[in-house]
Amino acid sequence: MNWTVKYLPEAVEDLRGLDGAQRVLVRKAIGKLAQNPLPETEGGYGKWLGNRNRAKLAGFLKVKLRGAGLRIVYRLIRQEEQVLLIVIGVREDSEVYEEAQKRIERHGL
């Protein structure tokens, strides 16, 4: 079963801003997410995020692309079988998570 993947407008821009090799890796990861976006504790690919420093991300998940140093932060909407991509970016300190927090607040998620 494939889940529907939706993007915040800013996440689309994140994807466009990556170089070609990074974009390929991210698209591959998004394809896996579409197949099984559940948390690892339920046999999926995502890891739960929590509340750290200024980022209040409890209830959201992430996927790490370790080799590329990229992170995808998303929200799982089970009742609609949807994945909402919040941010796609390089993890520099906690910058990607702080940006996710800003977008969550801006979009009222």
Language-model region placement:
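A short, surface-exposed loop/turn module that caps and links secondary-structure elements
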Residues: 32-64
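Arg/Lys-rich, positively charged N-terminal/basic patches that mediate binding to nucleic acids
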Residues: 1-31, 105, 109
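A broad, low-specificity signal marking well-ordered, structured residues that form hydrophobic/aromatic
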Residues: 5, 61, 83
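A general secondary-structure junction signal
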Residues: 5, 47-49, 67, 89
